[in-house]
C-alpha cells in the first residue's frame, strides 16, 4: 500500500495519517518524514514560507521518499501554475466559492486543449527538469490529488454543483472561515454552522448509500 499514491490509497478505502507543515524548517520536515505519516500538507496560505522555501522542504522530504502536498495561497492561475511546477503530490486551493471558480481551478491544472496551464516541461522540477516529460499528463490525471476548500456560505449554497465538477478529487471544509462567512465566527455549535457542515457531509453520505 505504501507504494501507492495518496489518491490511489484513498480510492482503495485506506485511512491515512497526515500532518500540516507550518514551520519551514528542513530539519523539522525530515523528522516528520521519519515519524510514520502517510502524507503532509505544506501550508503556503497561512504559513510564513515562500514557494522557494517549499522547494527546500520538498528536497529534504524526498531524501526519505516522501512527497508532500501544498496548500496554495489562492486559486489564481499564476499561483497554481507555480505550485504545480515544483512537483507536489497534490494541491489544496483555499476558499473556492462557486462552480465557475471550481472549473477554473481544474482548468489551471491542465494543459491545452483541456485547460490553460502554461507549459515549460524541460524547466520543471515536476518533470525532473525534462527527464520525465513523457507520461507527466497521465500522472497528473491518475496520481495528483486536487483538493478545494469550502469556506463560505456561497460555496455551501452551491455545494451539489461544486462537488460534481469533473477533476475535483476532494472537498475540505475550512471551519474558521466558514463560520465567519455565516456570521458566527468560531461558533462551531451554532445552528448556522452545524446546518452548513451537515449539508456538506450528507452529500457524501448519500453518495455512499447509493453505491
Model feature map: region roles:
Residues 204-211:
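Conserved small/polar residues in nucleotide/adenosyl-binding loops
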Residues 66-90:
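Active-site beta->alpha loop and helix N-cap motifs at the rims of alpha/beta catalytic domains
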Residues 46-60, 75-79, 97-110, 127-132, ...:
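Active-site-adjacent beta->alpha loops and helix N-cap segments on the catalytic face
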Residues 78, 93-164:
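Conserved anion-binding
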Residues 19, 43, 91, 105, ...:
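Conserved, mostly hydrophobic/aromatic
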Residues 21-32, 75-81, 155-163:
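Short, acidic/polar
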Residues 1-18, 133-140:
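N-terminal amphipathic alpha-helix/helix-capping segment at the start of soluble metabolic enzymes
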Residues 12-24, 145-156:
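Active-site mouth loops of central-metabolism enzymes
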